[in-house]
């Protein structure tokens, strides 16, 4: 796409130059550059947004309750996305948090939580703690949210390790941490 844009730009410039239209050349160059910038930006951020399942949506009142209780009421959509990723809202541990430190009622083995509401409470408490450790300032603080989400997945130790060693989340340092 970029090669075709460059070629078209060269052709337009030569046509405009032959007619002596300096202003026309500038206008054409600006238009082409704007178009090219939009195309390149859309290629880099081409992510499909999928809605959450009906199972996740059914938990929304419970999610709102515990999000408020744990001090993150503005993060309901993020919590729903975590649940969607972890379980699609299905099963007895929809937040997949049986192994986290906030689980005090069930064994710390995968799938041991048998109460969905308890899973949501524990998962939101864990996510709130991860967001706090990652120094997340708002639901728009994507760098801190990425760090917090990786900490939710790997354990909170990842967050402090990544912050101390690299100052941020990267895919490469997440892989490095997982190999330790």
At which residue positions do the language-model features occur?
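Small-residue-rich hydrophobic membrane-insertion segments
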Residues: 1-40
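Residue-level preference for non-acidic, small/hydrophobic
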Residues: 29-33, 82, 152
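Export/targeting segments at the very N-terminus of extracytoplasmic proteins
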Residues: 44-89, 117-124, 128-140
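Residue-level detector of well-ordered alpha-helical segments, enriched
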Residues: 74-79, 93-96, 144, 148
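Solvent-exposed loop/turn segments at secondary-structure junctions
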Residues: 85-90, 100-104, 154-159
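Short, surface-exposed glycine/acidic/tryptophan-bearing loops
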Residues: 90-110, 116, 168-175
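Extracytoplasmic/secreted cell-surface and envelope-processing proteins
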Residues: 91-93, 134-135, 157-162
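Catalytic and substrate-binding regions of cell-wall glycan-acting enzymes that process beta-1,4-linked
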Residues: 148-180
